[in-house]
């Protein structure tokens, strides 16, 4: 039960600005504010004017403010809440916060208002995470993805999957408790068909979510190739800054260099890697091993070639590993100014001449057809991991049925699938999950 009153600066407090907002929420929020506010206590969803005074030092006036009253449960937090709109000076804002703390409120933890909103049933974790995603969005596509989650349709889609599973679990429980009960045998083709239908929906969600996750967390692009083909030069030219060291000495890049880049509403995360070659130098070899590891982590593999160098076994290894892992593979020939002819197998660029438009447009084209209006996807790695776990549990259940296992074995996997789906929208009893998630929210949110 939530039984204390919390406060934090929701807007402002770090730089001087026009207006700051201080939020107070909890069972004693009205009484705490009344101690330092000279105006009237308004009815719910009204605004009243008055002074904030220092009641501990002769009622000295601190500021003229507007108080917004949100009483009862019909508000964001789901409990009595007051928002004080004061002048936005850093000193004034923090002075009012200190008065609220001195008069009985506790400083809120990061994300605690949103956590209370979740615990009070005002929103689920999908919307809570969407709010945090919107606050931290750095591209137009990220903003659209976050706002899309506000309408609750994704939550309803997850709930529908849970309801379908719950019905089947209920049927199986009856067959376990009352084996003599005459109804559809849970090991019939009909049950398998229904489970496969749910699994196929989840498979589609995973497919859609891979792309939405890339858009929100950044599309990971690993730049690979032999030494001195221009990997670092291409990265620097795209970023328009000297992020990576460029020399004529083979093996200059020995560790991973990462950089974020925004282009046409998308966020890209470039990973420049060590040139891949046969070497006995221990440190360089470690860097080369890391380069191959990045193929597994990447969404896109940029394979850079130099027309003045012949292809070798390392080029084949890069290409084959990217294809074996079903990565988006983009072969790029740098130093196009050295060529007289081209073919359609490669993209042709010149880092030296800053001629990189074909590469930029290729990267955008891969993701331009993403359907941001689809409700059947989840946004982040936490949600995606859970939907994948639910998918695996369903696969295990279907396999167990086909192998003729007893219902009490099959039902374990079905309950696990249901539990994973439930964790996507959130359960109030999962304290570790809530702690981990809300700690990343802003203070005052």
Swiss-Prot record:
Binding positions for (6S)-5-formyl-5,6,7,8-tetrahydrofolate per the UniProt entry: 23, 83, 122, 445
Disulfide-bonded cysteines: none
Binding locations of GTP: 228-233, 247-253, 272-275
UniProt key word tRNA processing: yes
EC number(s) reported in the record: 3.6.-.-
InterPro entries the UniProt entry points to: G_TrmE (IPR031168), GTP-bd (IPR006073), GTP-bd_TrmE_N (IPR018948), GTPase_MnmE (IPR004520), MnmE_dom2 (IPR027368), MnmE_helical (IPR025867), P-loop_NTPase (IPR027417), Small_GTP-bd (IPR005225)
Residue positions binding K(+): 228, 247, 249, 252
Domain of life: Bacteria
UniProt: Mg(2+) binding residues: 232, 253
PANTHER family: TRNA MODIFICATION GTPASE GTPBP3 (PTHR42714), TRNA MODIFICATION GTPASE GTPBP3, MITOCHONDRIAL (PTHR42714:SF2)
Complexes and interactors: Homodimer. Heterotetramer of two MnmE and two MnmG subunits.
Protein role: Exhibits a very high intrinsic GTPase hydrolysis rate. Involved in the addition of a carboxymethylaminomethyl (cmnm) group at the wobble position (U34) of certain tRNAs, forming tRNA-cmnm(5)s(2)U34.
Name of the featured protein: tRNA modification GTPase MnmE
